[in-house]
């Protein structure tokens, strides 16, 4: 398929948006249902909510958010849709005491399932979808230069920046500039035209609001429609997203989560409590309609958008993208910048907010106001966390701990069934830990012993590691044991370091390892994690050690199983 006459795709295998639904040929629409119906574990969804509620309290000094709406599901089932905390709590921020000035209790508004949020940078996904639609239709070229649509854009060294580089944040633009300081719309445009990139196009990854503001200008030029009209015509109306728009009307205000008491010096504009208007200063100065921020929506509407993409661009009778276009949004274009994986508009494989849901195909985005969307095509699951974390002031929150905690629980809610039998050994997902699974000492002195088992791993790449080790001196010293893994339809993979990290496809692998010769040899798995993030963890099943046909160890034998020493590992059915 040729998109915009610039990028030609060879026939694609079933991509992330196709994978899960394609097995049954279904393209589900959403409805509420039980965790069991969704194929999720209810205990972990309950823990997701409980953990999210802890961030309503000081964490550590102030609440991370005043409230949130949590939505999680799999396939066509929304198994969790829970409001917590307050949508409107504070009328002001007292910088002298670093406290929030609360509304009287009768004027505070609790979160509801349909509370509408200022999405902040999650808005970038809508702009990106609109751009990919135009690429698909041939009105926009993915590798075309931006200046071919906007001649003024060519100034100040920007003449070679492409549409793809805007979508993947590799244009060279700095993070942002204060457009709100320019008095007129034309003056704001002049700031963009005269802005000089800080790096050559394609030379570095640098996340920038200017990329999506520029893309807005391109879209409006090639379509002859404003961005808010495009959003309505091309996305929200076809998908029935009735609570998603720019510039919500005043009648929506009681159902909108408040954001910040915006005043200098922490805000670029003195506006007081921002409630029902876009929080971002540049988007506000652009009339509330901007490519980088300004969209308001609720959790259900975002779930519909996510389900549409996981369906390959279709929801019910409405198709907004082709499957090939969705594939481009979920495919990493930033292979030259490891750690900054990015599809067209979507961020990929970002543990810092996707937590254990992160895979090379997991797509999502966050917003400064406390919002996030995560889509995992490998498990056909989705998670939305909408919080008002700048209420009453942006300095009260830092990091993405609530997003990570929610994603970790959501990932754990997707069961991993044992390769054999009813249970398998599971490493857990604790931070800053070393979990070990040790077999009893075995006599392998004949030199023919071999370990066989099934292994499943999803590990934060590079930072965390699973190692197979052996000790011949009672555990005083350990040496790595090289091994080979294999799965049906693929060539065996050698692991000469005796270790694995990263993502294995979330499938079971067979494993064999030649065991060192020793009179008393102890084998163990060691899973080590750092203090920041974890993957879904590791599973081992069917552990057995053979010596020329003789079984030295088989965990299916109760006597052998009883001699396994597990620290941090547990037997789990899922």
Named regions from a protein language model:
Residues 53-110, 142, 180-181, 372-374, ...:
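A short, well-structured edge-of-sheet supersecondary motif
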Residues 1-16:
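N-terminal export signals
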Residues 46, 50-56, 70, 76-78, ...:
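Active-site SXXK
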Residues 13-34:
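C-terminal segment of N-terminal export signals and the immediately downstream linker at the start
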Residues 141-157, 237-239:
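Short, glycine/proline-biased beta-turn/loop segments that scaffold the active-site neighborhood
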Residues 41, 124, 298:
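Short, conserved phosphate/pyrophosphate- and ester-handling motifs at nucleotide-, phospho-/glycolipid
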């Amino acid at each position: 398929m040729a998109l915009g006459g610039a990028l030609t795709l060879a026939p694609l295998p079933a991509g992330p948006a196709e994978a899960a639904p394609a097995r049954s040929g279904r393209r589900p629409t959403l409805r509420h249902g039980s965790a069991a119906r969704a194929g999720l574990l209810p205990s972990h969804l309950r823990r997701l909510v409980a953990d999210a509620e802890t961030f309503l309290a000081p964490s550590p000094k102030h609440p991370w958010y005043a409230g949130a709406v949590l939505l999680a599901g799999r396939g066509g089932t929304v198994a969790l849709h829970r409001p917590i905390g307050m949508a409107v709590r504070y009328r002001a921020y007292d910088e002298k005491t670093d406290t929030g000035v609360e509304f009287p209790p009768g004027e505070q508004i609790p979160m509801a399932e349909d509370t509408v949020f200022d999405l902040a940078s999650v808005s970038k996904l809508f702009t990106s979808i609109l751009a990919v639609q135009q690429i698909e239709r041939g009105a926009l070229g993915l590798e075309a230069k931006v200046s071919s649509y906007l001649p003024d854009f060519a100034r100040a060294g920007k003449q070679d920046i492409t549409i793809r580089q805007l979508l993947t944040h590799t244009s060279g633009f700095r993070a942002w500039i204060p457009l709100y300081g320019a008095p007129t719309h034309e003056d704001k445009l002049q700031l963009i035209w005269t802005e000089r990139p800080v790096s050559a196009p394609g030379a570095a990854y640098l996340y920038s609001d200017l990329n999506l503001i520029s893309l807005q200008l391109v879209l409006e030029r090639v379509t002859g429609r404003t961005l808010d009209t495009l959003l309505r015509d091309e996305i929200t109306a076809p998908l029935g997203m009735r609570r998603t728009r720019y510039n919500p009307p005043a009648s929506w205000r009681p159902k909108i989560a408040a954001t910040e008491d915006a005043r200098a010096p922490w805000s670029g504009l003195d506006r007081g409590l921002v409630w029902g208007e876009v929080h971002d200063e540049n988007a506000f100065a652009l009339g509330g309609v901007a490519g980088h921020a300004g969209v308001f929506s609720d959790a259900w509407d975002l779930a519909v958008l996510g389900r549409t993409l996981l369906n390959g661009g279709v929801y019910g009778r409405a198709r907004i993208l082709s499957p090939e276009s969705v594939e481009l949004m979920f495919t990493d274009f930033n292979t030259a910048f490891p750690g900054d994986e990015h599809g067209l508009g979507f961020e990929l494989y970002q543990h810092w907010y996707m937590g254990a849901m992160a895979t090379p195909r997991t797509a999502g985005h966050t917003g400064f106001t406390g919002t996030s969307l995560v889509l995992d095509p490998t498990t056909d699951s989705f998670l939305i966390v909408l919080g008002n974390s700048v209420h009453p002031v942006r300095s009260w929150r830092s990091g993405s701990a609530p997003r990570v905690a929610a994603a970790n629980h959501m990932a754990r809610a997707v069961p991993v069934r044992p390769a054999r039998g009813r249970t398998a050994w599971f490493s857990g997902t604790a931070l800053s830990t070393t979990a070990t699974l040790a077999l009893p000492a075995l006599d392998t002195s004949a030199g023919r012993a071999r370990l066989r088992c099934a292994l499943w791993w999803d590990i934060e790449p590079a930072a965390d590691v699973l190692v197979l080790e052996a000790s011949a001196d009672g555990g005083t010293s350990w040496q790595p044991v090289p091994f080979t893994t294999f799965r049906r339809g693929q060539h065996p993979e050698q692991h000469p370091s005796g270790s694995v990290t990263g993502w294995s496809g979330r499938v079971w692998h067979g494993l064999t390892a030649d065991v060192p010769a020793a009179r008393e040899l102890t084998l163990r798995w060691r899973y080590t994690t750092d203090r920041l993030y974890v993957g879904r963890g590791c599973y081992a099943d069917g552990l057995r050690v053979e010596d020329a046909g003789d079984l030295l160890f088989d965990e299916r034998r109760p006597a052998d199983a009883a001699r396994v020493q597990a620290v941090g590992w547990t037997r789990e059915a899922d």
